[in-house]
Curated annotation (Swiss-Prot):
Expressed by the venom gland. It comes from Trimeresurus purpureomaculatus (Mangrove pit viper). This is L-amino oxidase. Its main location: secreted. InterPro entries: Amino_oxidase (IPR002937), FAD/NAD-bd_sf (IPR036188), Flavin_monoamine_oxidase (IPR050281).
Length: 488
């Protein structure tokens, strides 16, 4: 399973009992009110008691809430600090050359029903997202092997136990999580989640599932799960359950930002861009939100309720007057966020097709880590390759300038595809680099992830409301890094 492409749509959920189901883990994470949210997404109900609501942040979470509230007849004001709506779901397009690239989320899980309903409502076309390709390459420990052949970690010079030989790193990773899951099936889901939240994914794989240490290293390098090694096993199990159930992913044709843009156009009159919220003060039953406009004047909007739907780090920057509960403040400060760097090359010649690669990704332990060949069929001859790093892998590129980053990617590609290094720049040029950490409004994070113990300590506190001020950013969802749970 690709822990790496953590950006796409997916649905997950709350903790009911899960003793007797086909996939007990999936039941554990299914939120009891998911169907209710889906109904709201399909057809908005009208309200008999309209109120004025201020939304802070026009990312996926803010836009979808504002869209539903406005549809129900409430008066909505959306404040967005940057110049454009959509937050981390963004795309860069060069209309002249006929290519586009998703800078944020790249895929939507077919099982992500809330996102699919919204896409259907706006008439957006979906295209299958190719995640794997048997002809793609692994270039690890200075040896190149085709993905189809790299079934066996022994081929990549990892010493493994006899019982582990002949299995791919992804299989070993899923089996070890599966053992942990089987142990959980006997207990109730709440107990299972608490137990799983206590250990790191790497510790669980080595201790509970008795995988050899070298097998854990192989999974880290080949399944690119290294970045998530410190994440709590609960988060890893949740992602595995959701993604394994539906292996099919889609992408929105012409860019993932079509979804937020369509929502924004429907409520454009109520949204103010380049307005950064500074303080939210609750007095009696009203909330006053103070914000900076481009004219540098501080303006205030009074409303019946305010929902701050910003990224976790940005939530800490806005001051709430009836101070948020201490537990909520601690949770917002302590949730760890992962950074990402994505480096895009635009190519006039699809040199990877010579190796039979159409979409999917190659994996390496060189700095580029995962090089994905975008399957988005561009009309012109140009195509896009993305080198994608998350967490510590992304930090490697943060301090380097555009040219140095591109040189490293060219060098890594020449090794992976076994081409002369000077040949690739002759038909590819670096078109774009997206360092999520450097973006001002996102405040340095692309996705939240819980480290051990945080799930049981923080998941409720993070979503607690303070008087009439509500928090609904991505970090309050049960699954982090997926548009579907963010919309909810």
């Amino acid at each position: 399973m690709n822990v790496f492409f953590m950006f796409s749509l997916l649905f997950l959920a709350a903790l009911g009992s899960c003793a007797d189901d086909r996939n007990p883990l999936e039941e554990c994470f299914r939120e009891t009110d998911y169907e209710e949210f889906l109904e709201i997404a399909r057809x908005x109900x009208x309200t008999s008691n309209p109120k004025h609501v201020v939304r802070v942040g026009a990312g996926m979470s803010g836009l979808s809430a504002a869209y539903v509230l406005a549809g129900a007849g409430h008066q909505v004001t959306v404040l967005e600090a940057s110049e454009r709506p959509g937050g981390r779901x963004x795309x860069x397009x060069x209309x002249x050359e006929g290519w586009y690239a998703n800078l944020g989320p790249m895929r939507x899980x077919x099982x992500x029903x809330x996102x699919x309903x919204x896409x259907x409502k706006f008439g957006l076309n979906l295209n299958e997202f190719s995640q794997e390709n048997d002809n793609a390459w692994y270039f690890i420990k200075x040896x190149x092997x085709x993905x189809x052949x790299x079934x066996d970690p022994g081929l990549l010079k990892y010493p493994v136990k006899p019982s582990e030989a002949g299995k791919s790193a992804g299989q070993l990773y899923e089996e070890s999580l599966g053992k942990x899951x089987x142990x959980x099936x006997x207990x109730x889901x709440x107990x299972x989640x608490x137990x799983x939240x206590x250990x790191x994914x790497x510790x669980x794989x080595x201790x509970x599932x008795x995988x050899x240490x070298x097998x854990x290293x192989x999974x880290x390098x080949x399944x690119x799960x290294x970045x998530x090694x410190x994440x709590x096993x609960x988060x890893x199990x949740x992602x595995x359950x959701x993604x394994x159930x539906x292996x099919x992913f889609d992408e929105i044709v012409d860019g993932m930002d079509k979804l937020p843009t369509s929502m924004y156009q429907a409520i454009x009159x109520x949204x103010x861009x380049x307005x950064x919220x500074x303080x939210x003060x609750x007095x009696x039953x009203k909330v006053t939100v103070t914000y900076q406009t481009p004219a540098k004047x501080x303006x205030x909007x009074x409303x019946x309720x305010x929902x701050x739907x910003x990224x976790x780090x940005x939530x800490x920057x806005x001051x709430x007057x009836x101070x948020x509960x201490x537990x909520x403040x601690x949770x917002x400060x302590x949730x760890x966020x992962x950074x990402x760097x994505x480096i895009f090359l635009t190519c006039t010649k699809k040199f990877w097709e010579d190796d039979g690669i159409h979409g999917g990704k190659s994996t390496t332990d060189l700095p580029s880590r995962x090089x994905x060949x975008x399957x988005x069929x561009x009309x012109x001859x140009x195509x896009v390759i993305i080198a994608y790093g998350i967490g510590d892998d992304a930090n490697f590129f943060q301090a380097l300038d555009f040219k140095d980053c591109a040189d490293i990617v060219f060098n890594d590609l020449s090794l992976i595809h076994q081409l002369p290094k000077e040949e690739i720049p002759s038909f590819c040029y670096p078109s774009m680099i997206q360092k999520x950490x450097x973006x001002x409004x996102x405040x340095x994070x692309i996705t939240t992830f819980f480290t051990p113990y945080q799930f049981q300590h923080f998941s409720e506190a993070x979503x607690x409301x303070x008087x009439x001020i509500y928090f609904a950013g991505e970090y309050t969802a049960q699954a982090h890094g997926w548009i579907d749970s963010t919309i909810k």
